[in-house]
């Protein structure tokens, strides 16, 4: 990556930075669009088998909600799919390459999928043999490019800090006493909040797993509003992370005026009353909009009784010419006078509709701007910060959560709207997903800035998630032993959830107070021809055996594995045995936790992307009371870090067995 921190001509640096990222974004955009196009080209049945399409559907109108048309696509035969709420889908008459009809997924059932359309829905949607494909559009890439252009245009102090041309300024005063609204913050959280609020340009909060990063960030947001009297734009790269910020804010600070900007289908149902579409519909002036919509509907019905001026009937005439000829009430260019008069009536009513729509848009925009102006905090994804809705809006502070999971240009979308930046993240966990495999895009703005300006950052030190023994290895490997387990979780085990006398002897190898166990499986890594991903049958069988025991005692459990093929194999296996627990990749489970976590490493010959140690960190730190590691010891021992992991797991098990003997 170009070293933006070298001294030099600031104008050239800005231009170099913008050009570099413009090129990288375009490469990534092409990779993503090509990937989805190539996926869609695959035979429909094959694509359905891997969960990326649903075939042979029929649409049913369900109603309208928040400005969208809701349609249920169903069939008799149940389906398994990777498509989930919030996804964009391409709806087609069996051939997705010939369609440009997009919808947002609301809900996925066993044999139906509910979607929301923002456009008029064609009649064929309600007929047989409709196909739905998982899709991606390139709007976020367009917004990244627009943000880069704005970054180049503004060239303000924050831009120069990002490039290393200028240095963040120290606070004018550090002796100010803050009154914390969240009374349960620990000392490291309070310190991070105070330093962030008193900072003038930039502050970075490093939040390792379970340390209450989002909780800390929400206190920062409230302090910015209450103490600094600032208007805040709070963002995250994903809708789930944005909803987490919103949820914390409304639960802990109900007097705060918070508005969530985003498509209603991508916002949690529990939070929808704080969304912009909902607030618009409940505004006192919304009745005017409803009245205008009724008027449009009424005029459309009148209009459609007349002849639409299609090219066949226009014979090259413009609307104005048709209106002129109609007044003469004569035939023209071989068109009977009745047809000309009918077309004129259609045009007159269509013009009325357009005038009303313009009026409707003006009223909607006025209501929207009133709501946004009254808000203390606006919450959105990074991408939605660049939408038309927030065009022209400026903020005192930009707060970005999960900053270590977003590509640098994604963070620029909200950043160009503010004067001060506060970011929270953990660069020791997974980087953003980059299809082009470009290392320069994988290195995040959060990581760059925290390495450049360590004095403008702090780490949250107390973790509230896991047993201290589970924490031990990641703490040493990734966090320089700075983490401490809170007393509330320090010694938690499965035996807090299950009475020891109720455990059958055959289950005690797993259902015990040992927080970490490594189980060696001499399996074989396999790969199917049509998939680049790996699976391991022997490991899957061992996972099943262990999960059966955990489920028997109703212990909340998840299985994590780095490979999609192993995820699919395990899901089928669990379905055959009527086991209903979630299996996911490391990427799919980041930001979450459970009482017991089982990890299947899969590989037996080569490491593949097991080599990305951030994946290992994420996988391990999802567990609260029990972590079970399943892998091929002969392979894993060849890597220094994995060898340390095995030694650690065995030492924890040995230590607890000795304690049991001593009892």
From Swiss-Prot:
SMART domains noted in UniProt: DEXDc
Coiled-coil segments on the chain, per record: none
Family: Belongs to the DNA2/NAM7 helicase family.
Source organism: Methanocaldococcus jannaschii (strain ATCC 43067 / DSM 2661 / JAL-1 / JCM 10045 / NBRC 100440) (Methanococcus jannaschii)
PANTHER family in the cross-refs: DNA-BINDING PROTEIN SMUBP-2, DNA2/NAM7 HELICASE FAMILY MEMBER
TM spans (from-to): none
EC number in record: 3.6.4.-
Hydrolase as UniProt keyword: yes
Enzyme class: hydrolase
A Pfam match: AAA_12
Source taxon at top rank: Archaea
The name this protein goes by in its record: Uncharacterized ATP-dependent helicase MJ0104
Residues that, per the record, bind ATP: 207-214
InterPro entries: Coronavir_polyprotein_1ab (IPR050534), DNA2/NAM7-like_C (IPR041679), DNA2/NAM7_AAA_11 (IPR041677), Helicase_ATP-bd (IPR014001), P-loop_NTPase (IPR027417), SF1_C_Upf1 (IPR047187), SMUBP-2/Hcs1-like (IPR004483)
Example GO molecular function: hydrolase activity
Keywords: ATP-binding, Helicase, Hydrolase, Nucleotide-binding
